[in-house]
Amino acid sequence: MKKFTLLLLCFVLPMTSAYAARIKDVAQVAGVRSNQLVGYGLVSGLPGTGESTPFTEQSFAAMLQNFGIQLPAGTKPKIKNVAAVMVTAELPPFSKPGQQIDVTVSSIGSAKSLRGGTLLQTFLKGLDGQVYAVAQGNLVVSGFSAEGADGSKIVGNNPTVGIISSGAMVEREVPTPFGRGDFITFNLLESDFTTAQRMADAVNNFLGPQMASAVDATSVRVRAPRDISQRVAFLSAIENLEFDPADGAAKIIVNSRTGTIVVGKHVRLKPAAVTHGGMTVAIKENLSVSQPNGFSGGETVVVPNSDISVTEEQGKMFKFEPGLTLDDLVRAVNQVGAAPSDLMAILQALKQAGAIEGQLIII
């Protein structure tokens, strides 16, 4: 029987602040975020592992034309050391022109490997279509690919994706609303009304009354100085304040592929009884030979004989009393020896019966 893994998360928040969270660990400043960049380019210098797809040939011809080299009309360059790629990067907040960022390069054609290639100058654009960085450099590819003359092939990891550390130069700064207005808004990473109110209370206890207010379950607005230098010092002090976030909602997370189950601290069970059993149907096909009597004129034939047996396991039942916790659920499930599929069926049935106080999430 396939085993399942059961993980128990029991987070106990004491009354003291020994395990309190910093504001910077549970929230982020609104408008201060990274931005995704993307670009299309060519990788050259491949040892015969490139491609000759139409769009690669077109891009190659356009690149030569930019350097003043005009190919004769109708010419289709047969290239195997060039590959068309997409280049992606993440532009951190407050990045300044001249700073460098990492880029990821991935093949979009039929190239077999990017190992040993060099990315040619590629413009990286943001959502607004503006160029924010320019990428170029030698790729580092962890994967490999080898192919024999008889068609045998060995591939390790992914040879068509590589990275260039500090491979892009920032050319344009992304404007942020950090220095504008009279307020700074913090957005919680996990929305919760109680956490938002506790965070606002912690800021008010530090700065004074009416300095912070919870706007909703996600946002907390804090009055801040207008001077940008004072605002940086102000934010540095605020983000290091500690407070006790609220406990998370009662949840049971089930991974249907791995059989992993995570049960939250506040999951409670209502009165219920569950029967767990199984029925096995086995069908066996036996072939026998039918031999006719001598001089009867009949033919020898093969006759299939089906043997069907049904085996039913002894049903198992466990009962939940009011107010039982996840410990009781774990103990009961382990006693019946349920497989992952059986356990998920039990949890779904309990949820549909209204016997679980909490969310059941299957991923």
Curated annotation (Swiss-Prot):
GO biological process, one term: bacterial-type flagellum-dependent cell motility
Subcellular location: Periplasm; Bacterial flagellum basal body
Any coiled-coil regions, as ranges: none
Signal peptide stretch: 1-20
One GO CC term, this protein: outer membrane-bounded periplasmic space
UniProt KW Signal keyword: yes
UniProt GO MF annotations: structural molecule activity
Pfam families registered for this protein in UniProt: FlgI
Keywords, comma-separated and alphabetical: Bacterial flagellum, Periplasm, Signal
Top-rank taxon, per record: Bacteria
Function noted in UniProt: Assembles around the rod to form the L-ring and probably protects the motor/basal body from shearing forces during rotation.
UniProt subunit comment: The basal body constitutes a major portion of the flagellar organelle and consists of four rings (L,P,S, and M) mounted on a central rod.
Family from the record: Belongs to the FlgI family.
NCBIfam families recorded: PRK05303.1
Protein name as annotated: Flagellar P-ring protein
